[in-house]
């Protein structure tokens, strides 16, 4: 991790501790869902990207100072995990250089599947240890207590380092935390949707509960499905490349977010950064060290842009201004 720490000196943010574990991560990681194309249930939803391009994206993230990667069983039934492994090896990174997080898919399963599924995760990650293993969502045939006990068994067996959840409500997160506490382990994270365009966790108790319990929030979709980049505001014709569902969703969002995106552009001009970088910086800054985030990337410049969001600091006034403009979301 020394190389990463040296790179972090060029950034404006320190490494953050994942919950109450000893795992140190950059405030921005790289989400790997876009690497799912070609496999499993989610495969058809994403274009197939060549391994060469995936290698370049991961290398760009690493060179920008990012030290952790978030993948999942659901992301192509191992395609994303295996692609990440190949990319890390191509970049010359060892297990000690990076932090890898992945997830167990619980739908139509019980906690008894957890010790079996982990063997596939280990196989696909091929030598890169699982620093964080999460229950991907709350729908399951088992209780959170049963799931956490199965996860704790994996920690005891040395197969994972820490346990997290994703898309859990405040109450379900509290139950997971309590179950792990009985095993002498912390609940490290709750991975949920959060951005300037979706601040529901501030209103439904999830963020307050996470802060109370010392659980890190991992924010996914931090750019509002691309709306906060401003590209759809400048060129609405880009929507024609999207499905009917996405066009319907993004079209309404374009009008509602116009004022917010204009402010992101104005602030970005001050720092010579993009609206997306301002939006990411706000996510990792507004609540102190409570929230980290995982924007995805399919192109080198996107990974570079995400890493570059850690190279400047928004002022308190700018954070408050963006808070005010997005408070209705």
Language-model features, listed with the residues they occupy:
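Active-site mouth loops of central-metabolism enzymes
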Residues: 38-51, 103-112, 136-142
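Short, acidic/polar
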Residues: 47-61, 110-125, 144, 148, ...
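N-terminal binding-site loop/beta-alpha segment at the start of enzyme catalytic domains
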Residues: 2-98, 156
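Conserved beta-strand positions in the central sheet of alpha/beta enzyme cores
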Residues: 29, 68-70, 131-134, 164, ...
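Acidic (Asp/Glu)-rich catalytic clusters
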Residues: 85-95, 119-127, 153-155, 177-182
């Amino acid at each position: 991790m020394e190389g990463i720490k040296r790179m972090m000196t060029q950034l404006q943010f320190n490494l953050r501790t994942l919950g109450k574990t000893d795992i140190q991560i950059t405030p921005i990681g790289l989400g790997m869902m876009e690497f799912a194309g070609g496999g499993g249930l989610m495969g058809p939803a994403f274009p197939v990207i060549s391994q060469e391009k995936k290698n370049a994206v991961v290398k760009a993230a690493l060179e920008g100072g990012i030290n952790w990667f978030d993948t999942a069983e659901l992301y192509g039934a191992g395609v994303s995990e295996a692609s990440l492994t190949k990319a890390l090896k191509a970049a010359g990174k060892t297990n000690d250089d990076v932090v890898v997080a992945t997830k167990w898919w619980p739908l139509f399963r019980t906690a008894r599947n957890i010790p079996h599924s982990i063997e596939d995760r280990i196989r696909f990650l091929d030598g890169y240890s699982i620093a964080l293993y999460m229950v991907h969502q709350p729908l399951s045939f088992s209780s959170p207590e049963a799931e956490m006990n199965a996860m704790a068994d994996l920690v005891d067996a040395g197969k994972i380092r820490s346990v997290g959840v994703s898309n859990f409500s405040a109450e379900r997160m509290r139950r997971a935390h309590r179950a792990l506490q009985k095993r002498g382990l912390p609940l490290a994270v709750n991975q949920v949707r959060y951005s300037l365009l979706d601040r529901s966790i501030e209103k439904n108790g999830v963020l307050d509960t996470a802060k109370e319990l010392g659980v890190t929030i991992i924010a996914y979709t931090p750019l509002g499905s691309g709306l906060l980049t401003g590209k759809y505001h400048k060129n609405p014709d880009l929507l024609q490349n999207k499905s009917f569902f996405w066009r319907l969703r993004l079209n309404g969002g374009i009008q509602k977010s116009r004022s917010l995106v204009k402010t992101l552009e104005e602030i970005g001009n001050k720092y010579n950064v993009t609206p997306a970088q301002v939006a990411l910086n706000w996510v990792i800054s507004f609540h102190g060290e409570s929230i980290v985030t995982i924007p995805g990337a399919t192109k080198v410049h996107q990974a570079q842009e995400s890493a570059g969001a850690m190279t400047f600091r928004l002022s308190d006034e700018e954070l408050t201004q963006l808070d005010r403009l997005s408070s209705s979301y």
